[in-house]
UniProtKB/Swiss-Prot annotation:
This is Glutamate-1-semialdehyde 2,1-aminomutase. SUPFAM superfamilies: PLP-dependent transferases. GO terms for cellular component: cytoplasm. It is found in: Cytoplasm. It is an enzyme of class 5 (isomerase). Pfam families: Aminotran_3 (PF00202). Its main location: cytoplasm. It catalyses: (S)-4-amino-5-oxopentanoate = 5-aminolevulinate. Its cofactor is pyridoxal 5'-phosphate. CDD domains: OAT_like (cd00610).
Amino acid sequence: MGAHHTATEQSARLFADACAVIPGGVNSPVRAFNAVGGTPRFITSANGYWLTDADDNRYVDLVCSWGPMILGHAHPAVVEAVQRVAADGLSFGAPTPSETELASEIISRVAPVERLRMVNSGTEATMSAIRLARGFTGRPKIVKFSGCYHGHSDALLADAGSGVATLGLPSSPGVTGAATADTIVLPYNDVDAVDEIFEQVGDQIAAVITEASPGNMGAVPPEPGFNAALRRITEEHGALLILDEVMTGFRVSRSGWYGLDPVDGDLFTFGKVMSGGLPAAAFGGRAEVMERLAPLGPVYQAGTLSGNPVAMAAGLATLRTADDAVYAALDKNADRLAGLLTDALTDAGVTHRVQRGGNMLSVFFTAEPVGDFATARASETWRFPPFFHALLDAGVYPPPSAFEAWFVSAALDDEAFDRIAAALPGAARAAAEASRPA
């Protein structure tokens, strides 16, 4: 392996093999590099902040499996917990003590959550929370915000962020008008728009769902008081407030975004960090609402693998290992990365903004503050692919989309930042020299 990480023969071969059996060669669209071009790197191992690909290239990881790996990869406490539990069986289809332990740990951190139900993915968590909100209120309509991504269930794909934004789709083929007929999409950070829609049809609205601090149109935090305004408006009209913390939960603080902006949602959704990188998620909230779920109430929700003991073990080990020092390191590392990005892009004369949602961050190639999906899409996203590839070729792995957040781990050290600092000037020049598409 030379100074540059441009050898991709094995990744290219593996990608061709994958394309023969998997649509697009990937199991989640952003991994295909369609937004940036080039060959997706096939990762064979990870440890700490290092990723190693099939061509033996090593990268400083600034994706962290899209958020979960706050401790770094293969942390000994998490690996030991998973190995110990796996030796006793992988799945039972019956209650286990670890489900209660992890639920109790989460409830102890987020005060409005009195009851919690385990599921298998963030999509399942938000889908179930929406069903529960409708069942609890007896109302059909849901309010969401343009650019906020809540998984790929049909009703919530309307004007979503994440991969839908990356592909430039307004929604997705296959999502019928009937599926989104009761989904109202409003501009993010616009309290007046929320007030207006509630004045018009408030008695039909079951819930407002929002990312507690969005990271799926890039890092676009709520304006001060925005989430509190949603709380006020929903309470006035008898609707529920669902705060989606799948991305922010237990990453931006010990208590997630709630720890930074303590707004009492009626329901919360969690994922990513809470399962330490294994497939698990959860939704929870007020006991009065949660007790409408089967088997106590009439709102049905179920899952064969929900509460999987191996995922519960990974989640417990992650949360219990992530002490105050870990969260201090996450914030410090995000500060350091943001500073390096700002310095390099400024030195290269590139108009940009580095935006933060706690220790999540994004680079927008624009001079304007990015407060919603419209301003995110108006940025010079065509500068991002050469910026991305220059970093990748220098051994730094950022997210392969201009509309995704960057994530740090507590494992990053001076060696990691030395590599990032060495890579950024060339990447900034590549962004500066990029040509606007015809």
